[in-house]
Amino acid sequence: KGKGVGTKRATGTARVITARDGVERTFHQGDILVTTATDSSFMPYIRKAAAIVVGPLDQNVNSHAEVAGMALDIPVIVCNAKVVDFIPAHSLITVDAEKGFVYKGIPKEE
């Protein structure tokens, strides 16, 4: 659970990035970017991403990930927790920015 930015939902493969070595070969269009923080060097991956999950960050301050997500109209979840420790790499996840949730797999519709 975190602060959602936007109202969209996206499902894709979690690409957990802790170091950018070799990322350009493994990050694909529609993947979900999972990392501790972003900056302008992440833009090639953010442009391909279906969504962004980032943390731990202060939820009261607009982060680079939030601004980039709003500009590109992709869902973003900002968490207090270190998301790279909780979201398994290469797992199928769904990001629901309206609710501020990240789900394992595809959630059943309510």
Each model region followed by its residue ranges:
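Acidic, glycine-rich flexible loop/linker segments
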Residues: 8-31, 36-110
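C-terminal amphipathic alpha-helical interaction region
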Residues: 1-2, 74
